């Protein structure tokens, strides 16, 4: 089929005042129904397509009367004239060839092939005309080998062959420059006229976007607040953990200080206890020494004196007294060990002075009896051991002094006996 003959036939149809069917144009519609190839522009065969569509609907109603049975409650009933005018208005608003052109041509060439009732036929036609995508005529693309088509729709990959044209029709905007709400903003650019329903949909979509944006902002704000609260909680947790750690360290330091103080107190007690033991040992040793000194004095007396009953008794009495006085009690040991060195020295000096005073008295009084001498000797010998626990270093010297004193006293006593 040649394009020139088709264009001439369409021009002749438009020039006629009375619209009639044309066999050449009907053959063109049958060719499109079989192949889906439109060789001319939409504006060139639009008028004949509208004429043929209206004629087919009228013929279908005339040949097929309306349904006499009860209407389907699930389907809205629309009168024939109203449905016909709606379909014609939609098709008249196209700016390009709809991508369902092949199916529409099938319905125009063979209307009773799939439909028996007028209502169902009109609904089928309405479903195929309510589209927004458009296609280009096939003859324009014969020179290109990279055309990708599916059901008459071009894909963006074909734009390289036609850089000066849009993908979905001459009246549609380019995909790169298309706004987010292109369908709701201007529906007529894609082949359908503007309507109140499209405007309502546009307003609803804009309200949804505003609500979504406000919700996202609220979520972001709440997320920021939550993150801030989390940071505050982390900071407070860290502070409490640090405070607990410092408190634990302080308690450990206090325990260590207490342990050190206890150790120092134990050492001080040990140091205080150590000096007492040598004192007691010295006191014990000194208590042993006087006994030996008294024994020496008793032996010296026995050797120097002559045998007499009075002297032996005196010596025995003196020895008994000295032994009784030489046995120091625990209280004496304790006092001697606890007395200071200065006090011990003072006591020793006093005892020495008293001993010297007794010696001078004995030498000056030759008339004194032997019994008195012996008693004095016993007293002096008893006094010397009592002072001996205070110092262990002077004990031997004191023992020698007492021995000399007793020897002198024994000589004076012998002289007195001879004189009597």
Swiss-Prot record:
Region (Disordered): 157-420
Biological role stated in the UniProt entry: Regulatory subunit of serine/threonine-protein phosphatase 4 (PP4C).
GO CC annotation: cytoplasm; nucleus; protein phosphatase 4 complex
Assembly information from the UniProt record: Serine/threonine-protein phosphatase 4 (PP4) occurs in different assemblies of the catalytic and one or more regulatory subunits.
InterPro entries: PPP4R2 (IPR015267)
Sequence ranges of Basic and acidic residues compositional bias: 196-210, 229-250, 267-276, 318-332
Molecular function GO labels: protein phosphatase regulator activity
Protein name (record): Serine/threonine-protein phosphatase 4 regulatory subunit 2-A
Family: Belongs to the PPP4R2 family.
Signal peptide: none
Biased composition (Low complexity): 212-224, 368-394
Superkingdom, taxonomy of origin: Eukaryota
Bias type Polar residues, positions: 182-195, 278-296
Ranges annotated as biased composition (Acidic residues): 251-266, 346-364, 411-420
